[in-house]
């Protein structure tokens, strides 16, 4: 069976860090994840997905990620139930996160300019080196991922007509 979840979204409230009686860290948080389509009014709707993360990852999330942070989460879906104080059975579906990654710099999130840069939850702030960076004039919003690189190293491809299927 396969139970894999990959989410990218913004944290809707600061993660809530607690500890179990066995001193295991557990953090709960909610992610706002945009849907891929627009509604009848031309607006994108979002799903608000409850998540839980355990142990060191929970402490790291609580220390580094705050409300509004763009993060990526990998994990699995879990359903559980419990009886509330009124004696009613309550069913909960949530994502149990195995790992997370911060997907933008803190300065970008706080509106201090600069673009997004992927960073690990445990990485310190980016280098404070004041070396100027070369400016790029890329109007294409889609990343290239090396599509323009010549996979044949500029050498001619040798194909005879007998090799072609048509």
UniProtKB/Swiss-Prot annotation:
Signal peptide start-end: none
GO process terms (BP): DNA recombination; DNA repair; DNA replication
Cellular component GO terms, alphabetical: nucleoid
UniProt short sequence motif Important for interaction with partner proteins, positions renumbered to this chain: 161-166
SSB domain segment(s): 1-104
Keywords of this entry: DNA damage, DNA recombination, DNA repair, DNA replication, DNA-binding
GO molecular function terms listed in the Swiss-Prot or TrEMBL record: single-stranded DNA binding
InterPro entries: NA-bd_OB-fold (IPR012340), Primosome_PriB/ssb (IPR000424), ssDNA-bd (IPR011344)
Residue stretches of biased makeup (Polar residues): 118-127
Compositional bias segments (type: Low complexity): 128-144
Disordered: annotated segments: 108-166
Function: Plays an important role in DNA replication, recombination and repair. Binds to ssDNA and to an array of partner proteins to recruit them to their sites of action during DNA metabolism.
Complexes and interactors: Homotetramer.
NCBIfam families linked to this entry: PRK07275.1, ssb
Protein name: Single-stranded DNA-binding protein 2
Organism, as annotated: Lactococcus lactis subsp. lactis (strain IL1403) (Streptococcus lactis)
């Amino acid at each position: 069976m396969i139970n894999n979840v990959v989410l990218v979204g913004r944290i809707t409230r600061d993660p809530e860090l607690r500890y179990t009686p066995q001193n295991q860290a557990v953090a709960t948080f909610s992610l706002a994840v945009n849907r891929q389509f627009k509604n009848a009014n031309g607006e994108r709707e979002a799903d608000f997905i409850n998540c839980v993360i355990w142990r060191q990852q929970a402490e790291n999330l609580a220390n580094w990620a705050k409300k509004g942070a763009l993060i990526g989460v990998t994990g699995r879906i879990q359903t559980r139930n419990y009886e509330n104080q009124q004696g009613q059975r309550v069913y909960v579906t949530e994502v149990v996160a195995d790992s997370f990654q911060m997907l933008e710099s803190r300065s970008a999130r706080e509106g201090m300019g600069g673009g997004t840069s992927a960073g690990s939850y445990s990485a310190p702030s980016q280098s404070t080196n004041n070396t100027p960076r070369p400016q790029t004039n890329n109007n294409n919003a889609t990343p290239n991922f090396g599509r323009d690189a010549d996979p044949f190293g500029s050498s001619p491809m040798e194909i005879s007509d007998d090799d072609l299927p048509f």
